[in-house]
C-alpha cells in the first residue's frame, strides 16, 4: 500500500514493455529520417551493421542499473509529481506542454556550456524546447497509458544514451560542443512532431466531457 501511495507500484507490464519498444523504434526512425535528409543514410546503415553498435547498445542497457537513481529522481519529480498538478490546472494537453517548457528551461545551463558554446546557446535552448515538449508528450502518453513510473524513467535513460551508440562515435563526447543553428530548428520541430507529437491525439489526452446536470 505504501508503494502504491507513493507511485512506486509498477504495473501494466505488457503495455509498459510495448511503450518502451515503441520509443526505441520511433527514436531509430527519427535517426533514419535525419540521416536521409542529411545525405548520410549509407553511413547510418554502416553503423547499424557494425557489431560494435549492438555490443555498445546492450552495454548501455546494463549501465541503466548503475545510473537509475538520477533518472528516477527526475521522472518522479517531472512525470509523477508535477505533470498531474499542471494537467489539473491547465488541462491534459496544456499541462504537458507547459511541463515541457519548464523541463526545457531546466536544461538552460548545459545548453549554453555543454551541448554547445555560449554563442549558440539560444539556438540550443530553442532546440531544447522542441525536444522537451515533443518528447515530453510521448513520455506523458506512456505514463498515462501505463501508470508505471518506470516507463518514463527507462525512456529518459534511453533517450540520453542511445545517441552515443547510434551516432557511431560510442562516446559521450558526441553530446558536447554541438553545432546548433537557428536554420536547423524548423526541420527539427517538424520531424519531432511527426515522430513523437502524434500521441497528443490519442485517448489518454482526451479531455473528459462534464456530464450535464
Regions found by a protein language model. Name each.
Residues 1-18, 33-51, 70, 196-213:
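Membrane-helix interface linkers and caps
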Residues 24-32, 101-110, 157-169:
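Aromatic-anchored segments of alpha-helical transmembrane domains
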Residues 20-21, 64, 68, 97-104, ...:
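Residue-level signature of the transmembrane alpha-helical core
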Residues 63-71, 134-137, 189-202:
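Hydrophobic cores of alpha-helical transmembrane segments in multi-pass inner/ER membrane proteins
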Residues 72-100, 114-115, 144-148:
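Membrane-interface helix/loop boundary segments of multi-pass membrane proteins
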Residues 157-213:
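C-terminal membrane module of polytopic membrane proteins
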Residues 37-49, 112-120, 171-179:
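Membrane-interface helix termini and inter-helical loops of multi-pass transporters
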Residues 121-181:
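Functionally important transmembrane alpha-helices
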Amino acid at each position: 500500500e505504501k508503494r502504491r501511495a507513493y507511485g512506486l507500484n509498477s504495473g501494466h507490464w505488457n503495455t509498459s514493455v510495448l511503450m518502451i519498444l515503441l520509443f526505441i523504434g520511433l527514436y531509430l526512425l527519427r535517426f533514419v529520417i535525419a540521416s536521409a535528409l542529411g545525405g548520410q543514410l549509407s553511413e547510418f546503415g554502416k553503423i547499424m551493421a557494425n557489431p560494435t553498435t549492438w555490443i555498445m547498445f546492450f552495454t548501455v542497457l546494463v549501465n541503466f542499473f548503475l545510473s537509475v537513481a538520477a533518472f528516477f529522481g527526475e521522472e518522479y519529480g517531472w512525470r509523477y509529481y508535477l505533470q498531474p498538478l499542471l494537467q489539473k490546472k491547465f488541462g491534459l494537453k496544456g499541462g504537458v506542454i507547459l511541463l515541457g517548457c519548464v523541463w526545457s528551461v531546466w536544461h538552460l545551463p548545459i545548453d549554453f556550456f555543454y551541448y554547445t558554446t555560449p554563442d549558440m546557446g539560444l539556438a540550443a535552448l530553442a532546440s531544447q524546447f522542441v525536444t522537451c515538449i515533443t518528447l515530453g508528450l510521448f513520455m506523458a502518453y506512456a505514463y498515462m497509458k501505463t501508470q508505471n513510473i518506470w516507463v518514463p524513467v527507462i525512456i529518459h535513460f534511453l533517450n540520453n544514451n542511445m545517441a552515443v551508440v547510434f551516432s557511431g562515435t560510442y562516446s559521450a563526447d558526441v553530446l558536447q560542443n554541438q553545432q546548433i543553428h537557428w536554420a536547423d530548428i524548423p526541420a527539427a520541430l517538424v520531424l519531432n512532431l511527426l515522430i513523437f507529437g502524434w500521441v497528443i491525439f490519442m485517448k489518454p489526452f482526451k479531455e473528459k466531457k462534464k456530464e450535464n446536470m
